[in-house]
Amino acid sequence: TSFEDNKAPVTEDGKIDYSKDFFGKETNLTVSGQLEAETYAMALGKVYTFGPTFRAENSNTTRHLAEFWMIEPEVAFMDLDGNMDLAEDFIKSVLSYVLEHCKEDLAFLDQRFTQEEKTKPQLQRSDMSLLEKLKFVADNNFKRVSYTEAIDILRNSKPNKKKKFQFPINEWGADLQSEHERYLVEKHFKCPVILFDYPANIKAFYMRLNEDGKTVRAMDVLFPGIGEMVGGAQREERYDVLVEKMKAMNIDEKELWWYLDLRKFG
């Protein structure tokens, strides 16, 4: 559901009125096949899923879709460094192929992108054309920066000090928005960025807890003009730690008994 907590409209018998929700009715759609893919990775080592994914976010921007197709690799015994290497290599490989083999399509899209940019206020326009963005990502090494370092950079940035950010960065633990991610990529580092080691309380239960007890081995790949493009994480392989995280997030262990068994017998 896209309703806010405790604000969902209800019917006369007290049930949620899904006719007023995002999809207009009660709907169960796939968010991710990641947990299930882990079971296959335990047997095969390297697997991936590719298929439709759905979000119930009522976000009307050019960066959010109710439905999109997503690829999700799962690799047994891979740490976060390997995860980041895989994401960077995959992105560069795809973009290099597209730039070489889809020139006419890209020229059409680049022209359309340029026309759309002209309709925006000057401060909101991209500094690069579509083709320049793709080449920018394909040709540059990705900068790897911890979440903590990124927060320090953003907190001391001119847009933050001059209150230009819609969501000011005041303290560690903030969930970064697109404006923050784009600043890091386009203004500060001027190259694609991979942020890693996020606060545990803003990430999923299955991400491996670091020794500091407050961050997890998660990463996001950030693109110019967009922000987050890829997300990933090293999985929590320690059974006792995983159970404690599930309890802290009020996740029913009985519903995910099969997932926990991967830590017992995987």
Language model regions located:
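A generic structural motif
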Residues: 72-83, 225-228
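A residue-level signal for conserved active-site and pocket-lining positions in enzyme catalytic cores
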Residues: 29, 73, 150, 195, ...
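Class II aminoacyl-tRNA synthetase-like tRNA-binding/catalytic domains
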Residues: 1-76
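Cytochrome P450 heme-iron axial ligand motif
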Residues: 234-238, 242-245, 263-266
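Metal-assisted phosphate- and nucleotidyl-transfer catalytic regions
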Residues: 1-18, 22, 89-223, 248-256, ...
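His/Asp/Glu-rich mid-to-C-terminal helical/loop segments that flank catalytic regions of hydrolases
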Residues: 42-44, 79-100
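Flexible loop/turn segments at secondary-structure boundaries
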Residues: 35-38, 55-60, 78-79, 201-205, ...
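Hydrophobic (often cysteine-bearing) scaffold residues that line and stabilize catalytic clefts
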Residues: 83-87, 146, 238
